[in-house]
């Protein structure tokens, strides 16, 4: 039994099903994160909700707990086809879908509910086989692949009781909204299904979509600044472009860091950094749009298991990565969009753990620092790296 603690909400307090509580206990979650405490208060009553939260706040578990509770409380329809999911989660990237499905599998472990995923870049027939083998309770998918299955008549969305749209702002940016509209038209009307929408930002466009797709939603906002700065110690090193690689190598090698994410702005830069680290004896891998899907999933598993110490990524690939235990994020180049900075450093210091971000500001990217400071609402001290961090990289014989 979890002891009551002032200012904290326990999962016990929501009277969840024992099979779900068993899984929550296994995962070691005694108390809700702020977004979980707020969102579940509304969604467990069946209300629609719009949540503004960055990744790392526990929003995935919030909507999954809500879905699982709804499905356990309501018996499945007597007549249903294999390809008729009862809950649908749409997310913009393959990595995010895989991560949500992994969390869903952990939370449904003792419930008898089935979780399935549809993502592009993976074998269509293999995904079809899982659909034909058993009933689908929770379907997690990217919009394009879901439409493929829907248009071929393999998936029917008329039984969807709960629909979740995750990273809605990102779906807008990536041009997925027309596909999402087509999908939503196949589901029951908005008053007949529960709809939850999550976004890192509440732009006018996002709010317009929310209005169209939800009924009288609860609006929950978790300030991104807290996510960005409270648990992450932020540093900036002023360093010449030609010294950046030396600094990166020495930071990782001298400190024996185990799980580090390095961000760069361009795919060719990501490739170059990864190749040099590997050549210099540090186990590294890259994540960018050029890396095929099966390799991405293998890479993420290797990173999660500690076989890969350094993961080098672009912003698009990096945003879908949600792995606990990343101790350091290094910005090899500062992003031009300040929001990307917040997303990058949000890979560490997740779910209350502490983390460190180190940014390299060189002659080519120091201009990006003031807008980042403006977004954070504070200055980040710019320091010179100590001499031992600029030592030449030892030659491998």
UniProtKB/Swiss-Prot annotation:
Reaction(s) the record says it catalyses: ATP + H2O = ADP + phosphate + H(+)
Residue positions of motif Q motif: 9-37
Alphabetical UniProt keywords: ATP-binding, Cytoplasm, Helicase, Hydrolase, Nucleotide-binding, RNA-binding
Highest taxon of the lineage: Bacteria
Domain Helicase C-terminal residues, every copy: 243-393
EC supergroup of this enzyme: hydrolase
Binding positions for ATP per the UniProt entry: 53-60
EC nos: 3.6.4.13
Domain Helicase ATP-binding intervals: 40-220
A Gene Ontology term for the protein's cellular component: cytosol
Annotated GO MF terms: ATP binding; ATP hydrolysis activity; RNA binding; RNA helicase activity
Motif DEAD box positions after renumbering to this chain: 166-169
Matches recorded under SUPFAM superfamilies: P-loop containing nucleoside triphosphate hydrolases
General function of this protein: DEAD-box RNA helicase involved in RNA degradation. Has RNA-dependent ATPase activity and unwinds double-stranded RNA.
Record family assignment: Belongs to the DEAD box helicase family. RhlB subfamily.
Protein's name in the database: ATP-dependent RNA helicase RhlB
High-level lineage: Bacteria, Pseudomonadati, Pseudomonadota, Gammaproteobacteria, Pseudomonadales
